[in-house]
């Protein structure tokens, strides 16, 4: 079924890791962890495991950047199989919200990326019709999508000789989301020319031409979308829905009755509570939606009524991509130390935003059920999971029936030496080290604790003739990748930032990582963070890490010990096999953003920082402090360190205000 294509054979630790993981899956182990260091070829190991077990696979990545990277790699490994890409289709997303203190209602505002819509529809079709499928997804795969049973039922089967006329087919297509148009560059549409109807599905590049002779199908062809030439003659074809959410007329009728019933119950509650404004608001908004549903079959914000369309009870989980797979699919959670906390956090972030919408009469309580899965629901919907990380979290390690280590790098590259130097004179010492790196034609990364420090240090380095840029949270994902491309090309010698882990991109030109104030206790200098930062130089033969600190914290001690353990294993392997370490040489490819027009949207993982700060006015200072602390630790657990640092700074300010108030 799966055919893995590669000029390389598994080597180093890869063969034993592949054997153990395959054996674990075949023996029915529910949870396993692949603990693989940076540069050890974890993706190649995953590809080999998938090829060996021959089962559909879902690979979940913590962000779109890494998902797009993995998608490219799996496409290369499996050119003859279906490799699909499933991420949030929003280029920009402002969720619906209400801020009571300002009486401010914010309408949902979104910019949808048509390329990603096509890739999502291609995913749904592939997963429902084939078994040789690998889907690379972001955590948005646990958000609601259409009912897979409707997707199966509402397809249109056509065959040559079938009795059907062109207008009957047009009517059928309209019912599954296709629109009539003359613009053939659009997907999810059809056009009619005489006795010929051309269909342009969302899930494939090719179009389908259906030619009629009276009320009979005379010919079916696969055609080139742009020059409309015939690619292949077909005897029959199946047309799948053009959109994720499709429904039958019977389901629509039942949904409208169910919405009316819920509205009656909710209005009675609001009347009993004496909430006159909320009563009138909800009544007017919902009746308007019902009228649109009855006349058009659609209304803005229709997703908030999804429970009624699906026939779900209150609190029941929505349908997601997971429901489209066969029961035996395998899940790989990449960078699990980041992805698992994200999967845990998404439900609460979504519910807290909707609370005001429901309480103040903007939405019915059923809006709560248009949501991502809880972590417990996610675990119930999947079977076997392989967690993949260089630094697995406590959850992964506690539930895994086996932890498979992949320490050895095929390139022979050794984990960098870690030096601890005093903070006194640290900037001058750092400059000397950067100059040495620059003379070798290599690059450096410097991680600091605050955005202000990053800015000042970067400016200081520039004044001294060292080409420097700093990464900060105001840069969007594309701009951040552009900064790192400049570093790789040599346009920049050093990049300074608070969070240099966010991209997870390969930077083989980097031979020096400097960690300023390494002995500061906190999430920015935890054991996991330090090991991840150290790994940034593990792709260069001259890799070195300098920690500037006046004492050795427990986190530093554990990170250094683990790095030294990995160094020893690799050095022994190199000596035994006569391997001379060599730096990874990686071409500057077309970036995934340019290829897929992928943009990160900060709102994908729950409330944005701005939304959190805006809640200050509707909470007491004590409640606001509790919220800030909770969100700060959540951001830190997801390695969103710039967000965590912004929340920390706000927390300090509010605590200072609270202290002054109590001191009066």
UniProtKB/Swiss-Prot annotation:
Sequence ranges assigned to domain UVR in this UniProt record: 622-657
Pfam families found in the cross-reference section: Helicase_C, ResIII, UVR, UvrB, UvrB_inter
Domain Helicase C-terminal stretches: 426-588
Q: Where in the cell is it found?
A: Cytoplasm
Q: Give GO BP annotations, semicolon-separated.
A: nucleotide-excision repair; SOS response
Molecular function via GO: ATP binding; ATP hydrolysis activity; DNA binding; excinuclease ABC activity; helicase activity
Q: What GO terms fall under cellular component here?
A: cytoplasm; excinuclease repair complex
What's the family? Belongs to the UvrB family.
What the entry lists under NCBIfam families is as follows: PRK05298.1, uvrb
Under PANTHER family, the record lists:
UVRABC SYSTEM PROTEIN B (PTHR24029:SF0)
The name this protein goes by in its record: UvrABC system protein B
State the organism of origin: Thermotoga neapolitana (strain ATCC 49049 / DSM 4359 / NBRC 107923 / NS-E)
Taxonomic classification, please?
A: Bacteria, Thermotogati, Thermotogota, Thermotogae, Thermotogales
Gene name for this UniProt entry: uvrB
């Amino acid at each position: 079924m799966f055919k893995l294509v590669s000029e390389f054979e598994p080597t180093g630790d890869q063969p034993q890791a592949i054997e153990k993981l395959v054996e674990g899956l075949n023996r029915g182990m529910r949870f396993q962890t692949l603990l693989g260091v940076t540069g050890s070829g974890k993706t190649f190991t995953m590809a080999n495991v998938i090829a060996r077990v021959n089962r559909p696979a879902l690979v979940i990545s913590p962000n779109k950047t890494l998902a797009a990277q993995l998608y490219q790699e799996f496409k290369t490994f499996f050119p003859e199989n279906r490799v699909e890409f499933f991420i949030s289709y929003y280029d920009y997303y402002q969720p619906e919200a209400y801020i009571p203190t300002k009486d401010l209602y914010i309408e949902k505002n979104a910019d949808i990326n048509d390329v990603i819509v096509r890739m999502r529809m291609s995913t749904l079709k592939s997963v429902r019709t084939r078994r040789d499928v690998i889907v690379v997804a972001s955590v948005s795969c646990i958000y609601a999508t259409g009912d897979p049973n409707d997707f199966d039922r509402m397809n249109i089967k056509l065959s040559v000789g079938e009795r059907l006329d062109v207008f009957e087919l047009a009517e059928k297509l309209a019912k599954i989301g296709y629109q009539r148009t003359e613009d053939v560059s659009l997907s999810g549409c059809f056009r009619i020319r005489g006795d010929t109807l051309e269909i342009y599905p969302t899930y494939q590049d090719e179009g389908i031409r259906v030619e009629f002779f009276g009320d009979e199908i005379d010919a079916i062809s696969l055609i080139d979308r742009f020059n409309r030439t015939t690619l292949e003659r077909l005897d029959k074809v199946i047309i799948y829905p053009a959109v994720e959410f499709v429904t039958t007329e019977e389901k629509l009728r039942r949904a409208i009755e169910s919405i009316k019933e819920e509205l009656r119950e909710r209005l009675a509650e609001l009347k009993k509570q004496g909430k006159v404004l909320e009563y009138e608001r909800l009544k007017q908004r919902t009746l308007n939606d019902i009228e649109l549903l009855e006349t058009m079959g659609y209304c803005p914000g229709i997703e908030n009524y999804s429970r009624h369309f699906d026939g779900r009870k209150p609190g029941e989980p929505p349908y997601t991509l997971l429901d489209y797979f066969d029961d035996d699919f395998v899940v790989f959670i990449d960078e699990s130390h980041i992805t698992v906390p994200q999967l845990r956090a998404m439900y609460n972030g979504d519910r807290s935003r909707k609370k005001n919408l429901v309480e103040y009469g903007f939405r019915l309580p059923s809006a709560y059920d248009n949501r991502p899965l809880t972590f417990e629901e996610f675990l119930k919907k999947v079977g076997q999971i392989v967690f993949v990380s260089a630094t697995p979290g406590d959850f992964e390690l506690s539930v895994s029936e086996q932890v498979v280590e992949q320490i050895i790098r095929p390139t022979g590259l050794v984990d960098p030496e870690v030096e601890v130097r005093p903070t006194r004179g640290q900037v001058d010492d750092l400059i000397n080290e950067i100059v040495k790196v620059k003379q070798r034609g290599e690059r450096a990364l410097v991680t600091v604790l605050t955005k202000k420090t990053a800015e000042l240090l970067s400016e200081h380095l520039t004044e001294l003739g060292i080409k420097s840029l700093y990464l900060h949270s105001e840069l969007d994902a594309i701009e951040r990748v552009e900064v790192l491309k400049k570093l790789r090309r040599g346009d920049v010698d050093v990049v300074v930032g608070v969070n240099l882990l966010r991209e997870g991109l390969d930077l083989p030109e980097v031979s020096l990582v400097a960690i300023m104030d390494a002995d500061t206790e906190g999430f920015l200098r935890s054991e996991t963070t330090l090991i991840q930062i150290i790994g940034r130089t593990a792709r260069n033969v001259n890799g070195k890490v300098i920690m500037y600190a006046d004492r050795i914290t427990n986190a530093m001690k554990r990170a250094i010990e683990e790095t030294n353990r990995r160094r020893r294993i690799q050095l022994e392997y190199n000596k035994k096999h006569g391997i001379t370490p060599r730096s990874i040489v990686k071409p500057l490819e077309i970036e995934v953003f340019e290829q897929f027009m992928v943009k990160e949207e900060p709102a994908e993982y729950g409330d944005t920082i701005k939304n959190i700060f805006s809640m200050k006015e509707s909470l007491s200072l004590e409640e606001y402090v509790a919220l800030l602390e909770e969100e700060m630790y959540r951001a830190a657990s997801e390695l969103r360190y710039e967000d965590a640092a912004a929340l920390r700074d706000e927390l300090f300010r509010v605590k200072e205000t609270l202290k002054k108030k109590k001191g009066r």
